């Protein structure tokens, strides 16, 4: 597996003056990168309101998928501009060497985790298939969950975790990012205590995956495959969202600790326990590879020279 060193993602800028130093403070850079991404949000909202929503089916679905893919491309471009202009470094998070293998490895882990949690539900007699949709829906689901997962990886791991990691260290940043990720999903509805715990534990797993490689591919594959399998294929709620179309039409009835209830598999005891085991394992591997940063006040690092335009 290809990995960046944790220090490869630190800013290389050498600011002079008060405003220059202030702009390089990690929490300020979170605001700056958000401003860089504003054009993507404007593009998305304008195209959805003025073009996509006016289209009949099936063109509505096709154009929605196209816009989602363009969203990802635009985020990659804008974030790359941010790292080059503000942090004076290349966006090594998007390095393509070994990308397919990393994405596949992350996806395989999630397929196995969801498969084991789903298997427990089936064995418990709580899962019944009522119907099967056209296979075409799987392509739409792959695009929907793939692009959605990428954007969440960018927001919660590449931006929020990475920049707070640079300031307060990996462990504290991991806890903060996981808590914010869990609370951010409260707007989905159907949030329970077990659902919140499952989300926090799940994000610990995902943040650990990013901390290990310091690239988007491994964690993206893990996040996308989890949502795709849970909702797009198996027809179960995804983080409290129940109205999305799925390949399988199913009925799930059973205790919350087994099924996760209306929130989804991630709220089940099985999925939470498995995520803890795998997340701790990945985090230990990241530590063994020297990918865990200490807080800024406890480390001294010699950074490479900044990029010269």
Residue ranges and their predicted role:
Residues 171-172, 214-217, 266:
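Residues that define the loop-to-transmembrane-helix transition and helix capping
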